[in-house]
């Protein structure tokens, strides 16, 4: 029998439980066999012969605090996102974002070495699931942007931005910020990049989310958006300049009326799915305490 206080800590998906187990096992392996770190973590100087660590580096944590935080965050965010995206797309998102994040970290570390000639950038071990977690925050921003987060009283669309601001601010007071800050920044950007341009939409057979509400400038305050938009437009044209016109042809009819697969319609449909999934989760968690209460009352009557 589940108690009311524990209902919110149940109903995690099987996929998220499996991924959480991978994180825990990965942490135990590097703790009991430290010699495996150079083979699993991303160490830029050794990445060329050990190219697989562009993948493995994201699936284990070097610290106990890291594995606890990553496991708990994965379970709760996956509990919401996986039903909306589907298990296959959720797993694909994690794999692609993790790989692209550590690929960018590798390139950045090599560039910093050639600029500064400091070997610390070549031999610093990069590892952890926090890049993917940053990307998952972007997924929450996309699906329920205007939903207020309980206790925090802030809208979900600002979660990635607040996380980055706090991480950058804390980097001035910590010595190991280089080990996590690039991963968080690239994880956030790669999560947005994947959802913006790559994620397949089964309803429309198109890819990505080109709606204005999910533009890159929405990560910034409105005061800065006139400056950010022209810069973002350059990268947008580089990524999908030719396909943009094709997408518009599919999204709009000749009369200018939006079709079912248009940007605004798809964005609204995605938010409705997210809100419905959130309501179902909350409804399930409320149903369990109510059911337990009815069972207790029934047991009491039987005893009488």
Curated annotation (Swiss-Prot):
SMART domains given in the database record: DUF1751 (SM01160)
Transmembrane annotation, as ranges: 23-43, 58-78, 93-113, 120-140, 158-175, 179-198
Gene3D superfamilies, A to Z: Rhomboid-like
InterPro entries: Rhomboid-like_sf (IPR035952), TMEM115/Pdh1/Rbl19 (IPR013861)
Keywords per UniProt: Membrane, Transmembrane, Transmembrane helix
A Pfam family of this chain: DUF1751
One GO biological process term: retrograde vesicle-mediated transport, Golgi to endoplasmic reticulum
GO cellular component: Golgi apparatus; Golgi trans cisterna; membrane
Subcellular location per the Swiss-Prot or TrEMBL entry: Membrane
Primary site of residence: membrane
Disordered: annotated segments: 247-304
SUPFAM superfamilies per record: Rhomboid-like
PANTHER family, per database record: PLACENTAL PROTEIN 6 (PTHR13377), RHOMBOID-LIKE PROTEIN 19 (PTHR13377:SF14)
Name this polypeptide is given: Rhomboid-like protein 19
Gene: RBL19
